[in-house]
Structures are given as C-alpha cells and as structure tokens.
A protein has these predicted regions:
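A short helix-loop-beta-strand connector motif used in the catalytic cores of GNAT acetyltransferases and
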Residues: 46-58
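Conserved acetyl-CoA-binding loop of GNAT-fold acetyltransferases
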Residues: 130-140
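A short beta-loop-alpha structural element at the N-terminal edge
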Residues: 1-22
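Conserved beta-strand in the GNAT
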Residues: 58, 64-73, 84, 89
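Conserved acetyl-CoA-binding loop-helix of GNAT-fold acetyltransferases
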Residues: 90, 96-109, 131
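Conserved GNAT-fold acetyl-CoA-binding loop/helix
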Residues: 14, 22-45
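Conserved GNAT acetyl-CoA-binding A-motif
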Residues: 111-121
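Conserved acetyl-CoA binding element of GNAT-fold acetyltransferases
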Residues: 79-92, 118, 139-142
C-alpha cells in the first residue's frame, strides 16, 4: 500500500479526478455531499479552476483506492486555518484497519500551516481527528442561499 500525493505540480488526469470523485462519493457514508461538490473540491485542489489549489492524497493497493483525503488551501493564516480538510473516506472493507489514520498522519506532515475540518457533530470519525490533535474550537453557522 502506498500513498500518492497530488497537487498543482503533480497533475491529476481527468480520469483520476473522475475515479477519486466516484470513490469519495461511494464511500462517504451518510454524510456525503453531492457528486458535483466533491468533484469541485478536487478540481480546486488540482488548480483546474481558479484558486489557491490544495492536495489530494490517495492510498492504493495494486491500483485499487483504499482511502482518500482532499484538502483545499484557503490562503488565510492567523485568523483562519491555511488548509481545510474537505473530504476523507475509506473503502468499507478496509475501515478499522488504520487506513484513515495513515492518510491523516501523511496529510498533517505534508500540509504547511493549520488544518481545519468541518464535520457533522454525529460523525464517528471525530474520534480519529481528536487522536491526531484536532480540537473543537468553533461552531459553524451558515446562511444558505
């Protein structure tokens, strides 16, 4: 099993973007966003759309994606985190085997600056983030339009 890191310099192909988008959608459980939203976050990370870019981390075994994380850079520091971890998912058959922990450790080492995550308060993956040093600092309130 190896972790591959994609950013603006190690480009994602259109096929990679589709494959990773599908994986995240299929394995995000009950807390998933739309396919379109997931694809947009990957396109932003890959700098295929205007923005600061970010990172996509995937763990694979013989070409099969076992887990993936998407991080978007915010360009902010001191007052908000420089990075936001947008998506994390592990294939159902591999949950509980340390895949998410390894991916998250790699992500933390790779990303410069603070990392934030918006997560549903009922999502059990919160415990993984707490073990890695994440703290609940704020609540998000959103006016949806």
């Amino acid at each position: 099993m190896n972790i591959t890191t994609f950013d603006a310099f190690s480009r994602l192909s259109i096929n990679d973007i589709s494959r990773i988008s599908k994986f995240l959608y299929d394995h995000s459980g009950e807390f998933k966003d739309s396919k379109s939203a997931i694809r947009k976050s990957i396109m932003y990370a890959a700098k295929e759309v205007p923005g600061l870019g970010g990172y996509v981390f995937i763990m694979e075994n013989k070409g099969e994606i076992l887990g993936a994380i998407v991080v978007n850079r915010t360009g902010m520091n001191e007052y908000l985190a420089e990075n936001i971890l947008v998506y994390v998912a592990v294939k159902d058959a591999y949950r509980g085997k340390g895949i998410a922990q390894k991916l998250l450790s790699h992500t933390i080492k790779y990303c410069k600056g603070d990392i934030a995550i918006h997560i549903n308060k009922d999502n059990p993956v919160i415990e993984l983030f707490k073990k890695q040093g994440f703290k609940s600092r704020n609540i998000e309130m959103r006016l949806e339009r």
